[in-house]
Amino acid sequence: MKKQGFGTTKDGKEALLYTLSNKNGMEISVTDYGAHLVSVLVPDKDGKKRDVVLGFDSVTGYETDGSHFGATIGRNGNRIAGAAFELHGKTYQLAKNENNNNLHSGPDGYDYRLWNVEEADDSAVTFVLMSPDGDQGFPGNFEVSVTYTLTDENAVEIHYEGSCDQDTVVNMTNHSYFNLAGHDAGSIENQTLVLKAEQFSPVIDSASIQTGEHAPVQGTPMDFTSEKAIGAEIEADFEQLKLTGGYDHNFILDKAVEGSIELMAVASCKESGITMEAFTDLPCVQFYAGNFIAPVTGKNGVFYDKRNGFCLESQYVPNAINQEGEEKPILEAGDTYDTTTVYKFIF
């Protein structure tokens, strides 16, 4: 494990970058600022290492990043309609930071904070954060850890664990943007994807709040049950894609055993020879094709733009806390929040 400076935050605190490597030539870097996944170096079919996630060279880029490159999102990922929810008869008001809704817990997300480092060794780093009662509008003192592990099986494991002294809402995720040709390779539309999902969550309008329906993907451009290029139907004359400018939808995973870590997606790049398998124990995944990446200069001076990376964000159904019939992301006082998402690389 290598530790080095990653720049100084705007309030004068030093951020650190931790680099882990395995026996097969893979290498990942993570920072204590926002518990971001900064880089994932994977050997391609010719043995050349490619960095397959978008990001920045120092903490400064992450402080102003609105796209959440590599971010740990908390307390709640995705959207909450009306930026409010009711729990045990009490209404909790959150920040309205996208339209009239709350996105990724508001402008003071966990990805804009300096985390403590609890443990670091050659294969894993654990970041810890205390989120006090009322933080972002959520109830309860929530203590959470995020552990990044790089295995010799070429898997990046992200393990979340936390507890709270009151019942609260917790639905954390990682917002990495992947480009299996390399972060500097431009469009991801020729890369292929399989999603282990026969249903998706349609949205009401361009504000991207779900209708509450679980709609079949079959016969629509939302069908990724067999391998398909991301860009094959992204501009199709299909209302759901028009509303969101391309893919940015929740997919309900076909789980064999509820709560078990199972395959959720397989993405591949023929040009690099790199394949990524993604696994989670959560019930859903948000597939986002990077439709609204704001033009920005990233790592090594590379210019990022629309659809230069895609996200596979494991999660509960977005806005489930406000919808009847959905599994709600409620962490009860004294219980343990415990979930794992894995991105495994084949090269």
Task: Kindly label every feature range from the protein language model.
Residues 1-347:
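An exposed, glycine/acidic-rich loop-and-rim segment of catalytic or binding clefts
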